[in-house]
Amino acid sequence: MEKCSVGGLELTEQTPALLGNMAMATSLMDIGDSFGHPACPLVSRSRNSPVEDDDDDDDVVFIESIQPPSISAPAIADQRNFIFASSKNEKPQGNYSVIPPSSRDLASQKGNISETIVIDDEEDIETNGGAEKKSSCFIEWGLPGTKNKTNDLDFSTSSLSRSKTKTGVRPFNPGRMNVAGDLFQNGEFATHHSPDSWISQSASFPSNQKQPGVDSLSPVALLRKQNFQPTAQQQLTKPAKITCANCKKPLQKGQTAYQRKGSAHLFCSTTCLSSFSHKRTQNTRSIICKKDASTKKANVILPVESSKSFQEFYSTSCLSPCENNWNLKKGVFNKSRCTICSKLAEIRHEVSVNNVTHKLCSNHCFNKYRLANGLIMNCCEHCGEYMPSKSTGNNILVIGGQQKRFCCQSCINEYKQMMETKSKKLTASENRKRNAFREENEKQLYGSSNTLLKKIEGIPEKKEKTSQLQLSVECGTDTLLIQENVNLPPSSTSTIADTFQEQLEEKNFEDSIVPVVLSADPGTWPRILNIKQRDTLVENVPPQVRNFNFPKDNTGRKFSETYYTRILPNGEKTTRSWLLYSTSKDSVFCLYCKLFGEGKNQLKNENGCKDWQHLSHILSKHEESEMHVNNSVKYSKLKSDLKKNKAIDAAEHRLYENEKNDGVLLLYT
């Protein structure tokens, strides 16, 4: 008879009959193996028992784990303390032999929260007789009920399990596995996951610190309770509050938790597990350098004003050229056409009159606009300081019939000095008068120099010793008589003549610059007209071409004199005096826009407009445009100013003729 001992118990072939069950004996044999005893034939037969292969689909077993004693405690096996109870549908097997403690031990553990483990849906590769099998597990925690009678304590199967579990019989090795089924390797956890499982590991809600000396997933006989005191660290450990990663609801104790393989998130249900997904962050591409910006780096994101969207840049070096482009575009967009000078520039002033906004590019244009429209501002005329009320600035200066307000007396004094400096500048008529007077004196002096040269050449040789020639010149204007004694050596006479000749040549060159009168054909005018040419065209308006055989174009259309007439909505007819026809280019031009207009316009460019099919529409649209109206105002104002200046010049010319008759008397002695 073969024997083996387990902690003082001798096990023989009759041990199963004495214990009443093969499972009891098998569990005792496992205990023997775990403590280093060699396996006996009874255990071998138990492991190779056909009971294991009878039913591969066993119900899920709930294993209630109670605080185990320390590893060094002696194992006391007593037949009275081993009670086996299973569900009604479960067959006793060596693989599932479980021995609960006595009711006295359970009563001593009252107050310690026990945990219920449901093994389901986790695939572990285990070896049984050389064959590999896979299973899955999830863990459900619960509070088992403790009753006074031990025969009422049983194990029940879980209705939530989707697959059955089979555990291979292996030698019990305390310290090999922890409660959650993780292997201890060199004092560390090493969790094995199945690659095909959609739930990789189980959630654990530890209420008490587990001792690493118990393998809760291996068949083991629960020993008699020993006095066990937890350490201070174990007493201070508190369960962490765990919530569902999707719905953020807290996971209660006893609730099934789900976890995806390779993820640390826990879920309360499969619905939350399937609905929760981590989308991969797409790499953003920089606008300038076209590089994929890493998500870990802080990218520079700026809004685009035009689209109100955001653009990402890999670094500030990419941002700098883009900012420069935006600044250039912004500067172009901010430019508008000035109402006064018609230049495309940055607008500095905007004036709204009768719901019409007038844009002005500079202070000079703004002052012109104010004077033209009679606007008065509550600010100092000199420094521009704002005065909130009219009573603030009592310093008022009347200049040219207009009241100008100043903030202080110093501004008035500076403004007066500035006006005096401007008044010292000669007007155009005074400049012309002074130039004419200078020319007359030059001519007379040039003639006198020639006379002196002739006299010097006719002097006899005996008088060559004379070193000096005394010349007395008396000249005066009105009652003023100037006497000069000029000593001219013979060598200086030629220098004087050359100087006068150069002055006359410069004067003739200046006179040659003055352009001649332009022709009446606008097609022959230069692209840019100077001030004198423009004044000439304003004073002498070119006539409109009439009674002319206008040529036809390729479509058989031609210009007609009817375009010179505009029919108003009330039926009245007016003449378009600004419309000019060019016989050289067979096109029409706008006189006002040609003289004062800027920008692109069919009626002011070099070739003019020759779209005879749509000319009526073009003319109607053009004469109602803001640019044409402004140019017509400038034309009328310049024409009136030229008329006034012409009258003034005529009066000044008469005065000059009278002064000329009084003349300048030159006396040569």
UniProtKB/Swiss-Prot annotation:
Q: Where is this cross-link: Glycyl lysine isopeptide (Lys-Gly) (interchain with G-Cter in SUMO2)?
A: 88, 91, 134, 149, 166, 225, 443, 455, 462, 552
Which keywords fit this entry according to its UniProt record?
Isopeptide bond, Metal-binding, Nucleus, Repeat, Transcription, Transcription regulation, Ubl conjugation, Zinc, Zinc-finger
SUPFAM superfamilies per the record?
Glucocorticoid receptor-like (DNA-binding domain)
Q: Where in the cell is it found?
A: Nucleus
Per the UniProt entry, the signal peptide is none
Instruction: Tell me the GO BP annotations in alphabetical order.
Output: negative regulation of transcription by RNA polymerase II
A GO term from the CC aspect: nucleus
InterPro entries this protein is in? TRASH_dom, Znf_MYM, ZnF_MYMT-QRICH1
**Which is an annotated GO molecular function term of this record?**
zinc ion binding
Family matches, as Pfam families = zf-FCS
Claim: Chaperone is one of the keywords in the record: no
Renumbered zinc finger spans (MYM-type) = 265-299, 311-351, 358-393, 404-431
User: What is this protein's function per UniProt?
Assistant: Functions as a transcriptional regulator.
| Subunit architecture | Interacts (via N-terminal 120 amino acid region) with ETV5 (via C-terminal).
- Which PANTHER family does the record cross-reference, listed alphabetically? ZINC FINGER MYM-TYPE PROTEIN, ZINC FINGER MYM-TYPE PROTEIN 5
> What name is this protein filed under?
Zinc finger MYM-type protein 5
UniProt lineage = Eukaryota, Metazoa, Chordata, Craniata, Vertebrata
